[in-house]
Amino acid sequence: MDLQDNPLIVVSAGIAIVALIFWYVATEIDRRKRNVGTIAIGIVVALCLVAVLPVKEKLKGGIDLVGGSSFIVEIQPGKDEEGNPLPVNEGAIEDAKATLSKRLSKSGLSDNLMQPLGENRLIIEMPGVGPERRDEIRETIQRTARLLLKKVHPNSNQIIAQIEAGTKTLEPGYQVFPIRRTDPETGKVIGMDKILLSRRTIVGGDKVDLARPGDGLGVINVLLSKEGGKRLTNATKTMTIGSDRMAVVLDDEVLIAPTVNATLGRNFIVEGLDGREEVRTVSNALNNPLKYPLNILSERNVTARYGEEVVRQGVTAAIAGLALTLLFVLIYYRFAGFIALIGLSVNMLILFGAMAMFGATFTLPGIAGIILTIGVAVDANVLIYERLREEIAGGKSLINAIRAAYEKAFSAIFDANITTLLTAIILLWRASDQMKGFAITLTIGILSSMFAALLVTRVFFFWGSDTRALKKLSFMNLIPAKTIKFMEMRKPAFMLSSILLIGSLVVMGTKRESSLGIDFLGGSIVNIQLKEGQELSEATVKKAISDLTLEKKPTIQLEQPVGAEGDLISIKYASNDLEKIEKRLRSDIGILGEGQSIVNVQLKEGQELSEATVKKAISDLTLEKNPTIQLEQPVGAEGDLISIKCATNDLEKIEKRLRSDRGILGEINTEKNYDIAFDNETISASLGGEFLKNSFYALGLGLLAVLFYISLRFEFSFAVGAFAALFHDILICIGVVIMCGTELSLIHVGAFLTIAGYSINDTIVVFDRMRESLRSKRGDVAQVMNLAINATLSRTILTSVTTFVAVLVLWIFGGSALKDFSFAIMIGVVVGTYSSIFIAAPVVYIWSKKGSKLRQELIDASLDMPNDLAEPVPSK
C-alpha cells in the first residue's frame, strides 16, 4: 500500500497517535501508561512498516547518491499582453529558477538542483527520476502558463474563411489563434481550428491569485486578484450579454471561447483541458507562471554525483559504524542496552517511514541529519541510564529508580532536542533547497528520538518490571566518579581556544577564495559525448587527472543523454584548469586522443621540398600511427604544399621536429581534429551568493530562536555561554578543515550544520545538570558548577566516544567525498566536547559574576514555568 495515495489513513493514524501520547503523559498510573504506550508504539510501528516496505521502492535517494534526470533549458524572449516581443533581462535566470522550483516542488520533486549555465541557460537535476516521468516533467518545465482573456471577433468564422480563401486581409487590431476542437461526449481533444481574437488583452495571467482543479473533467477554477476581477467586470459590462464571446488563451492556444451570459467577477472556470494530468499540470503552472518561455535543449539520465562505489562504501561504513555503536551500548549497559537497541531501531524505523510516507529524498546533507539523529538518540539513552545508575546507587528500588531516572533526564532531553529542533525548522523554512534535505531528516529524527527515548524504552522497562523478567540492572563502569576542578582550568582553556581561533581566522583570511570549491565559486563544465560502442568510466577519468596540480578539485559525472548514441562524461572544474585537464585526458585515454590532424608546410616561390625529405626528418619519432605525406600544388599559391595527415596525439611531435629541422623550408601551420569533441561552457556556483545569504539568514534566525529559548528555560548567561561555544566550535572546525588543505563544498555545509546541532545538544545537557545543581545545592557557584560537570562527565565521554567511533569508521571505509564529510564531523565532536566543558560553562560563570544572581534567577525561572516542565525547588 502506498500511503502517499491514502492521506486519510495517515491523518487518522496521526490523530490517534497524538491522542494516545497525550493520554500517556496525562495518566499517573504506571500500568495504564504501559498499555497506552504499547498501543501507540504498535500503531507507529505498523504505519511505518507499511510506509517503508518494500524499501527499494519506497525510499528515494537524492541525485548526489542515486542519480536521476538532468535537463538543460534555455530562456527565450517572451511576449507582453499585446503580443509584442519582451527582451530577456538580467533577472530572468533567477525568476525562472524560483518559478520552476515551486512548480517541481508541487509535482513532488522538491530536492532538485538548479545551476545557471552561461547567460540564459539552466541545468536542472532531479533525483531518482527515470524515463517514466520525463514527459510529465517536460510539460511542467516548458509550460509558460501565459493565460490571457480576449474578446472574440463577432464574425470570427466568416472572416477566417475569407482570409483563407484570399478574398480578405486580416483586420488591424485582431490576431488569428488556434483553438482546440473537442469531442462533445468524451471531452478529448480531436483536432484544431482557428479563431479571430482582439489583440487587446482583457486580463493577463499575472492577475491570477489561485488556480485549482475543478469538479468536472478537464476543469480548473480560477480566482483573480482584486484588480483582475475589476478589469474583467468592467470588460464584460460593455459586452452584449448572450451574444459576445470571450476566449481563454493559454500559451497562445485557445482552450475555450464561450458566450458571455452575465457580468463576470473574480471567479471563472477554464474548461477544455485534456484529462486530469493536464488539469494538475496547468493549475500548478498558473499558480507559478513563467515570465519567459523555456526551451529544453537536452535531456539526460545522470549517475550519482559521488559515484555508485562511493555510495556503496558509505552505506557499508555507516552500517558498520552504527553496529559498533549499538554493540558498545549493549555491552556497557547490558539488559538496559538491549532496551536501548529496541528504542534506536524504532527510532530509525520512524525516520525512514516518515521519509517514505511524505516522499522525501535522502541526500548527502540528509545523511548528515541522520548521523546527528543517531548521536542525539544514543545521547538520550546514555543520559537516562547514567541517571538510572545514580538512582540505583542511591538505594532506590528498581521501579522507583527507573521512574526517577526518566523524570530527571526529561528536562535535559527535552531542552537539548527542542533547541536542535528550532534550528532545523528554521532551516526548513528559510534555507536553500540543498540544505532542506538536512532540515527534513533532522526534524523527523529529533521527534522520533524523543518518542523512542522517552516512551518506547520506558514502556519496555514497564513490561520488564511488571512481568518480573527484570529484577535488577547492572552496568559497566569504565569511568568512575571524578572531582576535577574544571572552572579553575578556564584561563589555560581560554588561551588554547584563543590560539585555535586566531589560527583559524588567519588561515581563513590568507586562503580566502582558494579554500572554496567549485560549488561556491563556479567554474566551467566540459561535456565529452561518446559514440555508440565507446566506453569510459568515471573512475578512469578520475585516475587520469588525479596527479595534476589543479586550482580546484573537479567533479566527474556519467550521464546518458536522451536520444544520443553513447554516454556523456561531464566534468566540472575551475576555468583555468581546462588546458591541463584536456591535455591529460587526450594523452592518457586512448579514445579521447583519437583523431586525424594535418600539418601543412607551405613553400614559397623557388623553395623546394620533397616528400622523402619530410619522411626522413620524422622517421625516428615514436608515433601512434604512420602519417601520410602528400605533395600538393594549390591553385593560386606561390609554391607547393606538403600535407602530412597524422594521428592527433602525434601532431605536436611532428610539428616540433619540422620546426627544428633546418632542411625543412616553408611556413608550417596545423589543423588539430579529434573524433570526440570537448564541449566547454561556463557554469555558475551551485552554492553562490543566494545560497550563502539564505543559509546564513536561516542559521542566524535559528541561533536567535535558540538563544531566546535558553534564556527562557535557563537564564541569559546560559544563552551567552551556548552561543560562545557554538561560535567557537564552528570557527575552529572550518579553520582546521581549511588548514588540512581541503576545499569547502556542499559536503562541508552539511557537516558544519551537524557540528552545530551536536554542539548545542552537548552544551544543553551540561547546562541542565548545572541548573539542577545550582537550584538544589549550597556553596560557591564555581564549586557547584564543577560538581555538575563532573556528574555529566561519564555521559559526555561515552556519547562523544560512540559518535566519534561511528564517524571514524565512515572516514576509514567511506569514499573520498565521505572522508571530507566525516573528517569535519570528527573534528567537531572533539571540539564540541571540549567547548561544552571548558568554554560554555566558564562563560556562564564569568557572565554571572557581572552582577546577575544566577542561583536566584534560576529558581525564579522554575517558578514561572508551567508545572509539567518545572522541577521541584528545594526547601531552604
What are these regions (language model features)?
Residues 2-5, 266, 277-324, 579, ...:
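Juxtamembrane "pre-transmembrane" interface segments
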Residues 18-31, 37-84, 481-488, 492-534:
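Transmembrane helices with small-residue packing motifs
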Residues 37-49, 338-359, 370-377, 438-453, ...:
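Small-residue-enriched core segments of transmembrane alpha-helices in multipass membrane transport
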Residues 81-259, 268, 587-620, 689, ...:
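Non-transmembrane, solvent-exposed regions of membrane trafficking/translocation machinery
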Residues 353, 390-500, 813-876:
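Hydrophobic alpha-helical transmembrane segments of membrane transport and translocation systems
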Residues 375-416, 460-469, 742-798, 845-859:
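Cytosolic juxtamembrane regions of multi-pass inner-membrane proteins
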